Amino acid sequence: MRTPRLRALALAAALLFGLTACGGQDGDQGKQDDSGAAGADGSGRFPVTVKHALGTTVVPSEPKRVATVNWANEEVPLALGVVPVGMAKANFGDDDGDGVLPWTEKRLKELDAKTPVLFDETDGIDFEAVADTKPDVILAAYSGLTEQDYETLSQIAPVVAYPEAAWATPWRDIIRQNSKAIGLAEEGDKLIGDLEGRISKTAAKYPQLKGKTAMFMTHVSSKDVSQVGFYTTHDTRTQFFTDLGMKIPASVSGPSESTKKFVLTKSAERIDDFNDVDIITGYGDDTGELLGALKDDPLTSKLAAVKRGSIYLLPGSTPLATAANPTPLSIPYVLDDYAKALAEAADKVK
């Protein structure tokens, strides 16, 4: 049930959204130059202006209280030594059920910090819980914010959304957007360089990955393999293959060119279209039922990758399940395990 304060926030956002739409404005929160200018706080880093898909956001001064919503945005400030006052509760890959992923717990311990307030986003963003943390800025560079979400959150604090499309922000841009918003753009660039170096070393450790084509399968159930879903080139999981030296097959890149969707589906009757795929990965289960279903089905069993066994399904109940969707703190934690599993699949490709 909505409280009066939450209803007021939503009403204010709706009114603002309506005025913006009628006026034909772009939703900008300020007019400062994109490079920012020396601020009154003397840091020389503020105000900061961040452009994104839902408008332009101005952070006027150094934020003392940083909140994050949706997946992994908290990892950028944490990696840079800033502890958020609130962040989204982990709803995937959380092995101990405390709502915090292990690499986040590790970083909080390194910073000698308590766990921030956890926002339960089971039914969407908890606007009132976010407001209760009294943030100076809200980070959402990797998110699925709607325009209404954005307008409502903007009544609480300046909001930094995704640069182009919902749930499609590459890990480098997650860092760039979020670090700029908290005045740590240079530190963010250094973090990117450090992670790129780590990824390069890992890729060199598994040379059998180089040049292999890979597809990330999704939305496939062990009870029904009649439809094969896959992430397009707009999704970070597919993009990460190229970081590891792999290639995107034409069966994935071709259909991706004519859509902005991050997931597409094909009938298993067209399974031969995917015979240019060397390695298939995806989300599995701890029982192995999905892999068994793919092998037993008269259509999917014809797929070359299924025949030779060059498939790796991420275990859904463990933190490793998140490895394919790279984030600043998860990369050092699970990268080697993920690359090793992909390399074992690559060894089966002749």
Residue ranges: model-predicted function:
Residues E74-D126:
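A short, structured surface patch at a secondary-structure boundary
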Residues T56, Q148, Q155-D224, A324-K350:
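Extracytoplasmic substrate-binding proteins
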Residues F17-A21:
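C-terminal motif of bacterial Sec signal peptides marking the signal peptidase cleavage site
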Residues G30-V83, A90-D96, A339-K350:
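Extracytoplasmic low-complexity, Pro/Thr/Ser/Ala/Gly-rich segments
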Residues V228-F262:
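Alpha-helical, coiled-coil/dimerization segments enriched in small aliphatic residues
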